[in-house]
């Protein structure tokens, strides 16, 4: 069975709160409100944010944005001792780790399923989720390295291209949109920007499946609502990675 269609998108763009800083007061913690703590430019937080949007939980899960450059002390002391984003405050508990949160949101809240019933697709999903860190490492390493795009990054992108051809019932990793796409798209979004802006390299050239994936995922409102300005992401990352 294919994953269900996304919850109907509101015609109005969600008004997002400003990021909280070291001088900001905390929200009324553990008052029964479910809160997703994010940083707007963080790809890991973006995963959980997309899942929340896709399942139509904008009224059930409140976004709380944290300024990672000027974090409020109460976030580590009272919310999430790991002091990272994303985290989810739900049922008087706080949970973290982005892929775990995507699965948790899918399991514990109503809305369209993020994983199909098909056992072959479920197995492939786990293989792809296990590969995310290696894909990200290969890509970021190449961005930082001097010279042309390294062989490891090319191989990683080619692996994604091949993975996107496994199921022919749609343009996404499992055919239809799923948690696997949610795991990868924040990073594919960034690598397209970074490889172009830093290495003058088009990640979609010679990769028609990846090109189609990017085109189709940008038609999904739950994702596009979470996108940040490409130039900001490029400059922010160049500064963070020490790239002139």
Curated annotation (Swiss-Prot):
Give positions of region: Disordered: 1-27
Q: Which stretches make up the GST C-terminal domain? A: 118-241
What stretch or stretches form a coiled coil here? none
Name the CDD domains for this protein. Answer: GST_C_Lambda (cd03203)
- Residues recorded as binding glutathione, renumbered to this chain, are 85, 97-98
The similarity annotation says: Belongs to the GST superfamily. HSP26 family.
Q: What is this protein called?
A: Protein IN2-1 homolog B
**Native organism:** Oryza sativa subsp. indica
Traced from the root, the source organism's taxonomic lineage reads:
Eukaryota, Viridiplantae, Streptophyta, Embryophyta, Tracheophyta
Q: Gene encoding this chain?
A: GSTZ5
């Amino acid at each position: 069975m294919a994953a269900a269609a996304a919850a109907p998108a509101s015609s109005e763009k969600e008004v997002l709160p400003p990021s909280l800083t070291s001088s900001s007061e905390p929200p009324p913690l553990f008052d029964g409100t479910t809160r997703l703590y994010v940083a707007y430019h963080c790809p890991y937080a973006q995963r959980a944010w997309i899942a929340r949007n896709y399942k139509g939980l904008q009224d059930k899960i409140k976004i709380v944005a944290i300024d990672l450059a000027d974090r409020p002390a109460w976030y580590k002391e009272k919310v999430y001792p790991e002091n990272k984003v994303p985290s989810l405050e739900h049922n008087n508990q706080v949970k973290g780790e982005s892929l775990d949160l995507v699965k948790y949101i899918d399991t514990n809240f109503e809305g369209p399923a993020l994983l199909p019933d098909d056992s072959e697709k479920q197995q492939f999903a786990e293989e792809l989720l296990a590969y995310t860190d290696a894909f990200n490492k290969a890509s970021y390493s190449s961005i930082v390295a001097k010279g042309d795009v390294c062989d490891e990054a090319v191989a990683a992108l080619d692996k994604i291209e091949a993975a996107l051809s496994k199921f022919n019932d749609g343009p996404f990793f499992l055919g239809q949109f799923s948690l696997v796409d949610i795991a990868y798209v924040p990073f594919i979004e960034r690598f397209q920007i970074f490889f172009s802006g830093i290495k003058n390299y088009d990640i979609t050239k010679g990769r028609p499946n990846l090109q189609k994936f990017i085109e189709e995922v940008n038609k999904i409102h739950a994702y596009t609502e979470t996108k940040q300005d490409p130039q900001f992401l490029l400059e922010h990352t160049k500064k963070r990675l020490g790239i002139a």
